[in-house]
Curated annotation (Swiss-Prot):
PANTHER family (alphabetical): S-ADENOSYL-L-METHIONINE-DEPENDENT METHYLTRANSFERASE YKTD-RELATED, S-ADENOSYL-L-METHIONINE-DEPENDENT METHYLTRANSFERASES SUPERFAMILY PROTEIN
Homology family: Belongs to the UPF0677 family.
NCBIfam families tied to this protein: mthyl_TIGR00027
GO terms assigned for molecular function: methyltransferase activity
SUPFAM superfamilies the UniProt entry points to: S-adenosyl-L-methionine-dependent methyltransferases
Enzyme class, spelled out: transferase
Annotated protein name in UniProt: Putative S-adenosyl-L-methionine-dependent methyltransferase Mjls_0570
Organism: Mycobacterium sp. (strain JLS)
Enzyme Commission number, as recorded: 2.1.1.-
Record GO biological process: methylation
Role of this protein: Exhibits S-adenosyl-L-methionine-dependent methyltransferase activity.
Sorted UniProt keywords: Methyltransferase, S-adenosyl-L-methionine, Transferase
Length: 249
């Protein structure tokens, strides 16, 4: 197994989750973050520099709060009867392995082919199996034909779906984007969508499309989880909001 290009940023977030897992009172437990770190090191990947590590530590409270919020979102979606989940740009978070999924759930993970290959090979070599009933990796470039590849992988466009868009701020910074057009097109009534976004543009657009939307700011979220930290965290989440939407029609 080789380490794919672009994996360093995903490893940086994995380092933040690994750190939170060892906190005195962690928001979540992610034993798989260390699996990815070890797999990357064993294949000659350089971990982030000291300067980058300092920046990671500086946004640790924000990153941990974000992870917790998306974890709770998926658990709530399952409790409300949704059995089809999609994570867009899943990165190296092993939610398919670490969350307590409802029996019968199918989880699709969309990401670049190299990232998914690295992720699944690392976990397989470590002897890990998904906790979700059906896990389906979908290798795709988000700029080209991802929704077609998702359908080809078995995605049911008639079934209400819980979507998550996390860590894609450059793509969703200015409101409606082709990504959300496509999600809207293949999401029937009863579907849910969780988005980490900059500003309220995404929330405003979803509201016009018939989604019921709630929004919480990053600072409020960190306070809720007892992770309201230093100035770096404050700067990181200054304009970030977390959007939770349900499609009624």
């Amino acid at each position: 197994m080789t380490t794919p290009d672009g994996i360093v940023s995903a490893l940086a977030v994995a380092l933040a989750r690994q750190s939170e897992s060892h906190a005195d009172c962690p928001l979540f437990n992610d034993p798989y973050a260390q699996v990815f770190i070890d797999a990357a090191l064993s294949r000659g990947c350089q971990l982030p520099s000291d300067e980058t590590s300092e920046r990671i530590n500086g946004i640790a409270n924000y990153a941990s709060s974000r992870t917790k919020w998306f974890d709770e979102y998926f658990i709530a979606a399952g409790a409300h009867g949704l059995e089809q989940m999609v994570i867009v740009a899943a990165g190296l978070d092993a939610r398919a392995w670490r969350l307590p999924w409802v029996a019968g759930t199918t989880l699709f993970e969309i990401d670049h082919p190299g990232v998914l290959k690295f992720k699944n090979e690392a976990l397989h070599e470590h002897g890990e199996s998904p906790s979700v009933s059906r896990y389906v990796p979908v290798p795709a470039d988000l700029s080209d034909g991802w929704s077609e590849r998702l359908r080809d992988a078995g995605f049911d466009v008639s079934e209400p779906t819980a979507w998550a868009v996390e860590g894609l701020l450059p793509y969703v910074a200015d409101g409606p984007h082709l990504l959300f057009d496509r999600i809207h097109e293949i999401s029937p009534a009863g579907s849910r969508l969780a988005v980490e976004a900059v500003g309220t543009g995404v929330a405003d657009w979803l509201s016009t499309q018939g989604w019921q939307v709630t929004v919480i700011g990053a600072q409020e979220l960190m306070t809720r989880y007892g992770r309201c930290g230093d100035h770096s965290d404050t700067d990181a989440g200054m304009d970030t909001v977390f959007v939770n939407a349900t499609r009624d029609r």
